[in-house]
Amino acid sequence: MKPNVFFGNLFLKFNTEKMNQNLGKLIHLKKLCTENSHFQMLAVDQRPPIFNIIASAKGRKHNYEEVVECKKLITSNLSHLATAILMDPHYSIPNLLQYNNSKGLVITLEEHDFKETLHGRYSSDIDNWSVEKIKKAGGDAVKVLAWYRPDSEKKSLDHQQKYVQRIGEECEKYSIPFLLELLVYPFQDDNNHTKEYIEQKQKNTQHIIDSVKEFAKEKYKVDIFKLESPVDSNDLENVITKETEDAFKNLANATNNKPWVVLSSGMGKTSFYNCLKLAYQNGASGYLAGRTIWLDAFKNYPNIENVDKGLKTESVNYINKLNDLTAQNAHSLKDYFKKGFEIQEPENFTKNFGGFK
């Protein structure tokens, strides 16, 4: 008899070769959660946003040591309040693991300097980096950001879909969760075009929802989504309209019952807090955020002492506020894990448990 494994809200029968991969993914995913199975994850993998902080303050291009210093400040002051931390392999992994006090480790795979055409963007891996290396480095999940909008040029759509599908297949092979971040973006001929990693102004809600629908298909093997707000952050500041509420409902429906967390895109603290409330009402299981938590402290940069003080006070207070909200309102994955670890014929586990292909 083949073993059964729960994944999301779907009860699936896997062959013995696949069972071990999903079991391994579940073990890693559980490490990213609180005891109540919520995600409270801190991002320090940012590259251009950190580069911009340094360039703006010093009037010149960043150097390697300055980027590491900024990331060290964030990691040492805030990681103990997170269930997991998202790190990059250029600056964070080789320098900051000893300062990480969270229990889970998510590692970035994609190159931040993407190729762009008039109506498309093209993602790629960091040079000399791979899913296999992330697994060997002790990662609990592979994070990939895929720029995507359904009305982009066909060549871009095909490339992005094949890119994500390849990574999903590699993550399954190496039994490590695949965390996919999706961001819509402005075309080069749009009035608000930018290559900066900031929230797109006047973004199209349907583009976001349709993008999630595409990558929720089983062929991409996504285990957890990292999603942006389906509406502009300005729409989250004060009175929440029915249109905004409906947008979050439609976003949740697009995930095909896969776990999802919310990203901040550097939006204001009030907007992000309200964004989380709406997301949690619609089944989100936590957050994976960075700039909204720590960026204000870097207004003091290059005064390191004041940056450190800001992180220890304002940033700590805010992440605690997010954690309280998450604990009270986020969708728990307890049943997801409990049912995922239900294995038929446990007495024959070693016999049925397959190896890597």
Feature-to-residue mapping (PLM):
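Amphipathic alpha-helical packing elements
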Residues: 160, 164, 168-172, 176-179, ...
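Alpha/beta enzyme core
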Residues: 72-76, 124-141, 156, 163, ...
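Alpha/beta catalytic barrel-like cores
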Residues: 14, 18-140, 144-152, 221, ...
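Glycine-rich anion-binding loop/nest that anchors nucleotide
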Residues: 224-229, 259-268, 288
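N-terminal amphipathic/basic-hydrophobic helices that include classical n-h-c signal peptides
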Residues: 1-18
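Alpha-helix-loop-beta-strand connector modules within alpha/beta enzyme cores
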Residues: 102-110, 160-176, 240-260, 313-327
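Short, small-residue-enriched loops and turns at beta-alpha junctions
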Residues: 150-151, 185-187, 231-238, 267-270, ...
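Short beta-strand segments at enzyme active-site cores
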Residues: 87-88, 142-144, 176-189, 223-228, ...
